[in-house]
Amino acid sequence: MADLGNPFDLEMLCLVTGRDFRWSIPHLDPVTKQPTPWPAGDLFLELETGGEHNALHQVYITGATGGTYTLNLNGTDTPAIDYNDVSENPQGLAGDIQDAIDAALGAGNGLVHPVSLFPAWTLNFNLNARKPLTEQLVNTINKATNDFFDAFDQLLGVDVEMTVTDTLNFQLKVTSRRSFDEVGVVTFAVGVTSTAVKNFFNGFSGLIGAVNTVNVDFYWNRTYDIEFVGELAETPVPASTANAAGLTGTSKAITVSVVEPGKDRLTIWPFTIDGVTASIKVESEEADKIPNRCRWQLVHLPTGEAAGGDPKQLGVVYRQPR
């Protein structure tokens, strides 16, 4: 029995490390072999680079006490997300965030991972004039801070960030290394008060009577991941942003970072078609991402066809060193 279809010869796509890749292809009539305009549609190189994964973005909210905020996901704003109200969705805080993400991306296209909450304190100190800050005193303050918060076993240690205003005033930002879930928030006892901090520091060796006043602000910093799934699975998603204008809190801030950018199994390099010639130029930074022995196809996708297309050539990549 005769073979069905036409086999393609295995050809080489040569890439030189550190150099741009450029190529042009004339379209020839299959009968006359004369140049003719390319048929309507798209022409592209399809490279099987692998490494497919979903995009994952992390939201980290600090220093807020209430209010609302919005996220911009894949170019679309979410409805306002209430910082504290968890009554609208029976799944709690993550459920309320999920509702907002569904409204922006469409149901099933974004998944909120569990929310982690970190107790955090901002402590503003004013020292007595006879005890101005010195390098030795700063070291003593850091030691006293860690000792004070080590008394709270549930925290499992803290991270301390110190900002000095002048020789008599400084600020400490203290964040628990342990995260809590929403049940933990209900049962966690907060015993950090201005009086407790002042008394502890004024009784600490090397700091006796040093603290004049201390103000304490308490926050539940929180972080959660958004995974892009469904129609956005294994797809590069632009960096998300946040608008914290509706939040309350003197040091409110939202940071959104890209943990994983998202990637399809295939890398597409489109050609530019101009009459009888199709041409392509790929910058070296992108060309260098293609591994040696990567399989490729040259595909023409006719206008009106959503997927598939007609293969024109195929082969493997040969990466030539400089």
UniProtKB/Swiss-Prot annotation:
<dbReference type="Pfam" id="PF23926">
    <property type="entry name" value="LtfC"/>
</dbReference>
<dbReference type="InterPro" id="IPR055688">
    <property type="entry name" value="LtfC/p132/Gp6_b-sand"/>
</dbReference>
<protein>
    <recommendedName>
        <fullName>Minor tail protein Gp6</fullName>
    </recommendedName>
</protein>
